[in-house]
């Protein structure tokens, strides 16, 4: 089951960046066989997520610029069907990449929000701890391994 230590702490915000207090880290749920989150561990996860947000926003902007270029080059009358098919494939590929980046951005921002509101590490399906090791490997995780495996079997 879950073990919650400490009490929920306030988060000071300076220039858009949250400062993690030790009590906030200790208040996050962990599995019984895990040590509580330390301030350093939570800061590391938060910084990774914030850098992912910046990277994903840049990648989305780049993909949207590529899509706009592909749409502008569009359908010119002198192209054969192979060229048109290639451009259509490239455009759809860029649109798919942009959509994937947007989904990852939403997941990343959601993980940051869960850290802020103290629900980071709680499985959204069963309410049990996700597991600190899983979150350190995949910080955007919202499901414990059991629930994730169940979801993938469906």
PLM-predicted stretches and their roles:
Residues 141-148:
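Cysteine-rich micro-motifs
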Residues 130, 151:
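Cys/His-rich microdomains that often coordinate metals
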Residues 117-119, 129, 138:
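Short flexible coil/turn linkers enriched for glycine and charged/polar residues
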Residues 3, 152-154:
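Short, intrinsically disordered, low-complexity terminal/loop segments
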Residues 102, 120, 141:
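Residues immediately within or flanking Cys/His clusters that coordinate Zn2+
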Residues 125-126, 146:
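Short, cysteine/histidine-rich loop/knuckle motifs that typically chelate Zn2+
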Residues 133-137, 154:
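Short Cys/His-rich "knuckle" micro-motifs
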Residues 2-117:
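Interaction interfaces in information-processing and related assembly proteins
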């Amino acid at each position: 089951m879950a073990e919650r230590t400490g009490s929920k702490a306030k988060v000071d915000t300076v220039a858009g960046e949250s400062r993690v207090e030790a009590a906030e880290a200790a208040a996050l749920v962990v599995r019984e066989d895990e040590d509580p989150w330390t301030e350093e561990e939570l800061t590391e996860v938060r910084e990774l997520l914030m850098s992912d947000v910046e990277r994903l926003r840049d990648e989305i902007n780049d993909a949207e610029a590529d899509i706009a270029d592909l749409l502008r080059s569009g359908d010119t009358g002198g192209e054969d069907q192979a060229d048109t098919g290639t451009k259509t494939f490239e455009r759809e590929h860029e649109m798919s990449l942009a959509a994937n980046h947007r989904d990852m951005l939403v997941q990343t921002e959601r993980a940051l929000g869960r850290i802020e509101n103290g629900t980071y590490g709680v499985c959204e399906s069963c309410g049990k701890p996700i597991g600190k090791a899983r979150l350190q490997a995949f910080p955007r995780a919202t499901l414990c391994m059991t629930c994730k495996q169940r979801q993938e079997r469906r």
